[in-house]
């Protein structure tokens, strides 16, 4: 069966892995997934990720992060979905938990956090929110 929302699948794998207290989770690889993981790593929500070979296909092993036994990611949600795309200008980017969380945005300059997008004065598709 074809995957209609690869990014939603990635976020669900991370959410489920943290609920199950896993050290790492596997996900099929794509450029978009890797860029989103770059943002999560820069912002300190995951320890890191590496590319692996999974039965002839490339995959990503995501190292999950915990703080005092609690997952670093308390909430992760897809904002722009295949059936309803959500776009925002740089001045209208949503703040998650009054700035405590991040919004992941796909911009012409790449996948950025909301703070980076505001700093570079670019808007784009609001992919997900994390805190």
UniProtKB/Swiss-Prot annotation:
InterPro entries linked: Ribosomal_uS8, Ribosomal_uS8_CS, Ribosomal_uS8_sf
The keyword Transmembrane helix belongs to this UniProt entry's keyword annotation: no
PROSITE patterns cross-referenced by the UniProt entry: RIBOSOMAL_S8 (PS00053)
The keyword NADP belongs to this UniProt entry's keyword annotation: no
Pfam families referenced in this protein's UniProt entry, alphabetically: Ribosomal_S8
One of the GO biological process terms: translation
Stored Gene3D superfamilies: 3.30.1370.30, 3.30.1490.10
GO MF entries: rRNA binding; structural constituent of ribosome
A GO cellular component entry from the record: ribonucleoprotein complex
Keywords: Ribonucleoprotein, Ribosomal protein, RNA-binding, rRNA-binding
Top-level taxon in the UniProt lineage: Bacteria
PANTHER family: 40S RIBOSOMAL PROTEIN S15A (PTHR11758)
Protein family according to the UniProt entry: Belongs to the universal ribosomal protein uS8 family.
Function: One of the primary rRNA binding proteins, it binds directly to 16S rRNA central domain where it helps coordinate assembly of the platform of the 30S subunit.
Subunit structure and binding partners: Part of the 30S ribosomal subunit. Contacts proteins S5 and S12.
Entry protein name: Small ribosomal subunit protein uS8
Lineage: Bacteria, Pseudomonadati, Pseudomonadota, Alphaproteobacteria, Sphingomonadales
Gene: rpsH
